[in-house]
Amino acid sequence: MSNITKKAFPVLNMHCAGCANNVEKTVKKLAGVVDASVNFATNTLSVSYEADKLTPGEIRAAVLAAGYDLIVEEALKEERQEEAQEKHYRLLKRQVIGAWIFVVPMLLFSMVLMHVPFSNEIQLILALPVMIFFGGSFYVNAWRQARLERSNMDTLVALSTSIAFLFSVFNTFFPEFWYSRGLEPHVYYEAAVVIIAFVLTGKLMEERAKGNTSTAIRKLMGLQPRVARVLREGIEEDILIDQLQTGDLVVVRPGEQIPVDGRLSEGESYVDESMISGEPIPVEKKVGDRVLAGTINQKGAFVIKASGVGSETVLARIIRMVQEAQGSKAPVQRIVDRVTGIFVPVVLCIAVLTFVIWLLVGGTDYFSHALLSAVSVLVIACPCALGLATPTALMVGIGKAASNHILIKDAVALEQMRKVDVVVLDKTGTLTEGHPTVSGWLWAQVQEEHFKNVLLAAELKSEHPLAGAIVSSLQEVEKIVPAQLESFESITGKGIKVVYQGDTYWVGSHKLLKDFSASLSDVLAEMMVQYESDGNSIVYFGRGTEVLAVVAIADQIKPTSAEAVKELKRQGIDICMLTGDGQRTALAVSGKLGIDRFVADALPDDKEEFVRELQMQGKTVAMVGDGINDSQALALADVSIAMGKGTDIAMDVAMVTLMTSDLLLLPRAFELSKQTVKLIHQNLFWAFIYNLIGIPIAAGILFPVNGLLLNPMLASAAMAFSSVSVVLNSLSLARK
């Protein structure tokens, strides 16, 4: 297999979990499809397919043949889906109002005026508009599925109401059939139309509630401007956002949303990036600085050279990531899918069995009892409650996480997070600000003129975070000019060595001292101990076997780190800190934060090995880092959590991304995962219990005990309430 493409398409005309199952089966049968899944809550098909064997148009054709539709055009896809859903909601609203206009007088005739002349005929006339105009879609959809040898909730509604209606029509025009057998001919028009009215009402409430579950993603989409102002041949021109191209010059005025990712080519301003990074203070932007789509220009006008447009912006990636996460399936969903796949056929069998048993043991009213019980079984059964249980909880949980600047990759990550019992934190950039500065220098007694030039040149070539602090101090503060080096070599996990005018110089951690057989003078050693005891990181600079300088580098602990550690402990999670710094520095930092366990002098391989050791002890490990010196440990951990501001490549590979530098997001993420998974289990429990209890009661299992026989009208109300209650329960998470 080659050229695998993964895409998500909005699905139209789905009415229940059975519909979602049918669409999924249809797409999976297509040649070239690697995998497909349908999320009923989001009305989305996620499909991986071989692009050289299949096109989106062919996928849509197959879905159309199954009675549904796809939006495959990329342009304004979300807007078209929202428009279709709004149109469907308005149609449902008209159907509900129209149905109840006829149902209310129908109930009057069936319960109060049943003895007036032509009561049955009047009820028939009132029932016809409900059956044909307002509930007609149930029969059309059920027939379409039957032709494909499939079934869904429409099948149950169509069968139950048709049986009640046709039986009533027969009794209206041929009452003698029953009179001749000494029986009273009953009509159940009210049952048929009330079932339709209740089901439509339930669907209307369900659609409204489902719409509320996608609030977070709509807010993110609202950050995308529709129009951009481009500069072409010196003339400003307004164009649609999807017409922008990489390299375009985009003009942004004060108060406007930035439409593209790019860098300032003219002007300067302050930009509000809180919607992306969560940082509340506007960030100063000058020529050459990067800006992101969706952020807001505060003051001056400027021109951006676009580097990311449309689906390539950071905002678009965030939206795509949240959508994919909301559309992913929790491990437990596989069981639910199997149940919903056979649900309707099983219910049909139970209804037939109920009818037969009542005919055999039903007594004098055997036929009416058999009919009503079979109809009640068909009506009360609800695959929608099962189908909505997991995806609605995921939508709300992952959406709430996104609104809190926490990006969760998928449902599996959410499930894994609640099992975590050890969090491993990389010190630099995670517990600390990640903006190291030189806090002290101590040079050996003999300092040659070119030493700082060599040190600057070496650190300019280094990728280590601490190198930037030395570069800033020498280049920007002391205005040192870098020397011309003859060679450069990186020593993994230790530092670097360079050659200048035939001499070998080295910069790095204390591990390099052993490599070069170098030792500290008493003065340098004493100062090094003082620096480390204050929590500073130490960088050594030497030539051959001689240590030339000790540089102390401070990286301030984040204001929220100690509180985050305390909150994680409250949740029962053990915490370990990993750092490449020495023992004294690690002890000083861990003491300030209340972390009991740490590993100092840790190389990237050591961090990976530490995570592996924890896993061998049976621990579920979450690794939190910035992806610089901890990528191996992040990859190995059960849950990988990246610290970033939405611009990191770590966002693509980590299971969870904290979009701001606030470490309090970490315990919040774990809390949200536990709440969401708990909600999924609650929803599934009640959905299963509802069907396990409701179907036997509808079949008449309590009749021998207390004479209770469930009216089909009450059964339809219970069915409508079951799926609505699942969605409302999911929405309760948004209020926590």
Predicted feature residues:
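Conserved catalytic phosphorylation-site environment of P-type ATPases
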Residues: 276, 372, 382-458, 614, ...
